[in-house]
């Protein structure tokens, strides 16, 4: 689960990570009524969307007066912000965050993520933070260092002193912030915390000028206070609907809808669709216990995308028996009167019985025995 920058800074504040003071506004009028709480002559106005790259896209503005801040807020509210992370359709700005300006001496990058190879959190630090961090990673990887974390000691500052020209005082201040975000990471079951930039001010203080936190969806039941931060307006409505039925769904830009059991098989299915020259419209994992109802809902979600021109169902029967899933497919197809081509590949437990159910259904369902064959058939039907 993602949250907005202003919400992430509220979390930081609880863990004593220094952040600039600010407030949320949904209109220019709110700026005038709230700006008195900020002790600054310069203000930063930031569009609040669940995507990075806002600065380069015009979603972060520096205002040198209250009137200018109001105008920026007025311009941003309701606009569609397109960044390299939003996709071409962009995201609508419904809120902005107005905060005190900071005197910036130097920008750094600091994040905490889960390393899938090590199966534990790691810190990532760079002396070149800011809007161009992606370019730094691409062109100057030596300026980025990863820290393996010993859970017993959290942050080890020795690599900072050996890789970067930092004073003992700078290392101490960065280490203190790193330890605090590690505490926040563990306490909230976060999957990622990012500060970009972490700035050193002219007075020598370090402040989290931006904040990003993602949380582990599987741990949210332990954190009702974090669930309250969820902004459904920022999420894809199909993904919200899918979560109600235990379906893992991610909308994409292609024309072939996918219904698969198992995340690995789902990714392999999308890969082979691309291999044969088409694009998947979604990732959809129905899990290991799908029923007629969940299959029906899965079809509804897939077909709610007007770009879908065909559907590939790829099921490997293990816990999920192929005859049960076949019955669910037939029932759902009859109920919904599916008009687009439907290719079904069944393999595993009771797959022969499943194929027989499909054949005797009287529906125009195209059967396939192998994934390669299934992908070629659906690509041919769509093209």
Curated annotation (Swiss-Prot):
Pfam families: ATP-grasp_2 (PF08442), Ligase_CoA (PF00549). The keyword ATP-binding applies. GO terms for cellular component: cytosol; succinate-CoA ligase complex. One of its GO terms (molecular function) is succinate-CoA ligase (ADP-forming) activity. GO terms for biological process: succinyl-CoA metabolic process; tricarboxylic acid cycle. Binds 1 Mg(2+) ion per subunit. Its cofactor is Mg(2+). InterPro entries: ATP-grasp (IPR011761), ATP-grasp_succ-CoA_synth-type (IPR013650), ATP_grasp_subdomain_1 (IPR013815), Succ-CoA_synthase_bsu_CS (IPR017866), SUCC_ACL_C (IPR005811), Succ_CoA_ligase-like_bsu (IPR005809), Succinyl-CoA_synth-like (IPR016102). PROSITE patterns: ATP_GRASP, SUCCINYL_COA_LIG_3. Residues 9-241 form the ATP-grasp domain. It catalyses: succinate + ATP + CoA = succinyl-CoA + ADP + phosphate; GTP + succinate + CoA = succinyl-CoA + GDP + phosphate. ATP binds at residues 46, 53-55, 99, 102, 107. It is an enzyme of class 6 (ligase). Its EC number is 6.2.1.5. Mg(2+) binds at residues 196, 210. Substrate binds at residues 261, 318-320. Keywords: ATP-binding, Ligase, Magnesium, Metal-binding, Nucleotide-binding, Tricarboxylic acid cycle. Pathway: Carbohydrate metabolism; tricarboxylic acid cycle; succinate from succinyl-CoA (ligase route): step 1/1. Succinyl-CoA synthetase functions in the citric acid cycle (TCA), coupling the hydrolysis of succinyl-CoA to the synthesis of either ATP or GTP and thus represents the only step of substrate-level phosphorylation in the TCA. The beta subunit provides nucleotide specificity of the enzyme and binds the substrate succinate, while the binding sites for coenzyme A and phosphate are found in the alpha subunit. HAMAP family: Succ_CoA_beta. Heterotetramer of two alpha and two beta subunits. Belongs to the succinate/malate CoA ligase beta subunit family. This is Succinate--CoA ligase [ADP-forming] subunit beta. It comes from Wolbachia pipientis wMel.
């Amino acid at each position: 689960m993602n949250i907005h920058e202003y919400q992430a800074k509220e979390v930081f504040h609880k863990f004593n990570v220094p952040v600039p003071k600010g407030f949320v506004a949904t209109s220019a009028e709110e700026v005038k009524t709230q700006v008195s709480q900020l002790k600054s002559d310069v203000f930063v106005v930031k569009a609040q969307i669940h995507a990075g790259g806002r600065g380069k896209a015009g979603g972060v503005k520096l205002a040198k007066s209250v009137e200018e801040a109001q105008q920026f807020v007025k311009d941003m509210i309701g606009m569609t912000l397109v960044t390299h992370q939003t996709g071409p359709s962009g995201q609508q700005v419904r809120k902005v965050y107005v905060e005190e300006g900071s005197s910036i001496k130097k920008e750094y990058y600091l994040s905490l993520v889960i390393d899938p190879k090590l199966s534990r959190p790691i810190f990532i630090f760079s002396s070149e933070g800011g809007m161009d961090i992606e370019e730094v990673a691409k062109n100057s990887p030596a300026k980025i260092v990863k820290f393996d974390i010993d859970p017993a000691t959290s942050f080890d500052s020795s690599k900072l002193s050996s890789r970067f020209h930092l004073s003992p005082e700078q290392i101490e201040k960065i280490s203190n912030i790193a330890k605090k975000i590690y505490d926040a990471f563990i306490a909230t079951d976060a999957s990622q915390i990012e500060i970009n930039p972490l700035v050193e001010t002219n007075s020598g203080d370090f402040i989290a000028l931006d904040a990003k936190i993602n949380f582990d969806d599987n741990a949210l039941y332990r954190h009702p206070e974090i669930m309250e931060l969820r902004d459904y307006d920022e999420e894809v409505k199909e993904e919200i609907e899918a979560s109600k039925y235990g379906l893992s769904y991610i909308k994409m830009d292609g024309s072939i809808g996918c219904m698969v059991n198992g995340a690995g098989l789902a990714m392999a299915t999308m890969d082979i669709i691309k291999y044969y020259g088409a694009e998947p419209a979604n990732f959809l994992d129905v899990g290991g216990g799908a029923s007629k109802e969940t299959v029906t809902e899965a079809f509804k979600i897939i077909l709610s995308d007007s770009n879908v021109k065909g559907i590939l169902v790829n099921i490997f029967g293990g816990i999920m028996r192929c005859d049960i899933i076949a019955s669910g497919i037939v029932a759902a197809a009859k109920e919904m009167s599916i008009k687009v081509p439907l290719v079904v590949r069944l393999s595993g437990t009771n797959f022969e019985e499943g194929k027989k159910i499909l054949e005797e259904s009287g529906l125009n369902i195209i059967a396939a025995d192998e994934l390669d064959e299934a992908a070629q058939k659906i690509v041919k039907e769509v093209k």
